[in-house]
């Protein structure tokens, strides 16, 4: 069997976690993936503790550190195949190597201006749902490519 695909879900904030949980659970049942999770050290202590408590119970390995600088180094040293984030307002390039595929899963309901204003050149993929969100991104100059016919239904 070839080496599993390493994928980290970076729940920078607690509110990113609900978008990640179904994927974490799904991929954890597939031997082709090594699952990792993490959350920022730059958030409030209460939020960090709550998010950490949830992530430690999820399948896979919880990556943590006592500082954000150390967390960056630990994650970067994993030399991940895939890095999934919930927003791009931080230096993604500090967490990943050049070979890492970086994806962002949009969170919440509705469309937020941050979808097209918070662009990070290190993002390779954006996961969105629904024609309305896709059209909003296109209207604001974000180049999109469908990955599923589901958006056309």
Question: Where do the protein language model's features map onto the residues?
Answer:
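A short acidic (Asp/Glu
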Residues: 18-21, 46-50, 94-96, 115, ...
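Extended catalytic core of nucleotide-activated donor transferases of GT-like folds
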Residues: 49-119
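Short beta-alpha junction loops
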Residues: 39-45, 108-109, 131-132
């Amino acid at each position: 069997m070839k080496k599993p695909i390493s994928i980290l879900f970076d729940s920078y904030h607690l509110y990113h976690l609900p978008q990640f949980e179904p994927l974490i659970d799904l991929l954890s049942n597939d031997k082709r993936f090594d699952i990792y999770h993490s959350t920022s050290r730059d958030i409030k202590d209460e939020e960090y503790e709550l998010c950490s408590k949830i992530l430690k119970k999820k399948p896979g390995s919880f990556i943590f550190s006592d500082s954000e600088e150390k967390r960056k180094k630990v994650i970067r040293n994993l030399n991940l195949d895939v890095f999934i984030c919930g927003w791009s307002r931080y230096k993604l390039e500090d967490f990943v190597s050049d070979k890492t595929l970086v994806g962002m899963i949009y969170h919440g309901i509705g469309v937020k201006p941050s979808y097209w204003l918070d662009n990070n050149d290190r993002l390779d993929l954006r996961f969105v749902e629904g024609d309305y969100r896709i059209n909003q991104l296109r209207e604001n100059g974000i180049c999109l490519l469908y990955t599923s016919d589901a958006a056309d239904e």
